[in-house]
Design a protein with these regions (language model features):
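Short, low-complexity N-terminal intrinsically disordered segments enriched in polar/charged residues
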Residues: 12-39, 44
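A mature extracytoplasmic/lumenal domain signature
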Residues: 46, 56-57, 100-104, 119, ...
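A short gly/proline-enriched turn/hairpin at secondary-structure junctions
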Residues: 46-61, 76
Length: 143
């Protein structure tokens, strides 16, 4: 029975991911890179400069990797993040906006925080790149 449940879950996840637009898939990949703490892949998946509007403050970094401190996140208890909602707001040939609701979890799978972020993506060099994030509330990147 457990095997059947696992197979159905995997099929469900596979079916859901195939329904996503290319910008939504780009955001999923970004979360995979973030969870892997892969700064190089995060930089490659984002436009330069990267801006974040967070708690009413506008912050700009040359590269996404300059914005995040995984050591600081881990010291706050962060172990990984998980997307709950991935909604395409807008897409044209050059830009897209994706509305994300996600949670950060600790190593015991307890929710640390839940946030809503709208990401702006740009289409450059044949790929969707994360350019800006608009946070509804306050979201730490470990700094």
């Amino acid at each position: 029975m457990k095997t059947l449940s696992l197979i159905l879950l995997l099929l469900s996840l596979s079916a859901n991911s195939s329904d996503l637009s290319a910008p939504q898939v780009a955001i999923q990949k970004y979360f995979e890179y973030f969870n892997a703490k892969d700064i190089d892949s995060l930089n490659n998946a984002s436009g330069q400069p990267f801006t974040l509007i967070n708690g009413g403050r506008i912050i700009k970094w040359n590269k996404y990797g300059d914005s995040v401190d995984f050591g600081g996140l881990e010291s706050s208890g962060w172990a990984y993040s998980r997307i709950h909602q991935n909604e395409l707001v807008y897409e044209d040939d050059m830009t897209a906006m994706v509305n994300i609701n996600f949670s950060r979890y600790d190593s015991a799978d307890a929710v640390i925080s839940t946030s809503d972020v709208i990401y702006l993506l740009v289409y450059r060099d044949g790929a969707w790149k994360l350019k800006s994030g608009f946070v509804n509330g306050n979201l730490t990147l470990g700094k």
